């Protein structure tokens, strides 16, 4: 450092005497500074072993040379403009490195994005340094933006630049010997709030498993246990959407328990406590019903059918076959609950001869066939249930006109031919909509007969 200080003062005096600043710098200062960095580059916070480095090159090749030496990568890519290409031979000479030049326009940010993506795909598993020291503002900004984005998918990427501790305003240069390569921390690791935005985005899209993973990772990186509560919330909705009611209930109960602790009374999720308690109560009701398989537990039937109809609505655009299955099953549960009010079960309805004959006639009317062509199954299907309940005076179903019922008959009878059941058919959106509409009407009737009130599986807002 003493030698460089002395050189710097002699350089200053030579410039004051009227010498050319650039030529004098190259003659007096640069060889000593370059020799120092070739031997031991100054890197903050500490030297790291990069396998690949990518540099933007403008009209300051000295800074780029220091960045190449500081990164120490075996493979060096240089993004240059047509104007800065003239510095490539000098960079090779100063660094002793083989360079892989890539020409781009000085304002072509999209080209930088494409090149960084290409290079990271080519070197996916190794540490990569992205150096934005030199080049135009557009080039540096583009490389920084690319680095921030791709660090989400390539965590070994680091953004670096050559900084200095002392700038000489008279000579309008960083004071030689004060330069250092600064390696910026990955913001996705250093700043949990960045990942909180990603987690929030995933949560809003219904990607609850991925959101939970982000929240758990943030706990590990920051030590802030508040994110663990968000992870529990996302995990509850993930399990709920997967129809794993036991796991959803477990996560929901644990979440409410933690929100009750003094340390979390001011947690943003406590502002949604009433809605959360109602959702956990719904999960408890469904869990009891699934374990007991007793249609007298109407709150559980309601919760399960409500969930299935919600999933049908979510899936109708992207997965019509799944939407149909959800809607079919929701309607079946609601019809079975109404049948249970009569003391009957679909799998063993115990029809009297008179009831069987009346049901044949009702089905024949709906299907437009002769009664003798109707075969009654041992277990009542969807259309059989609907027709039988109407015969027994079910008020909600009795309000449906014969035309409406005939419109539904084909869709109800076609359940077993659906692609994910026993057949090859994909139910039409119109058929699914009709089934869901009928189920929704029965759900509202059941809702009025439960103590739960209107509830929604919709995720509560995160509060940030």
Swiss-Prot record:
Tagged with keyword Hydrolase: yes
Keywords of this entry: Antiviral defense, Endonuclease, Hydrolase, Nuclease, Plasmid
Notes on activation and inhibition: Non-specific ssRNase activity is allosterically activated about 1000-fold by cyclic tetraadenylate (cA4), which probably binds to its CARF domain.
UniProt-recorded Gene Ontology molecular function terms: endonuclease activity
Enzyme Commission designation: 3.1.-.-
Oligomer and partners: Homodimer. The protein forms a twisted, head-to-head dimer; the composite ssRNase active site is formed at the dimer interface.
Record protein name field: CRISPR system endoribonuclease Csm6
Organism: Thermus thermophilus (strain ATCC 27634 / DSM 579 / HB8)
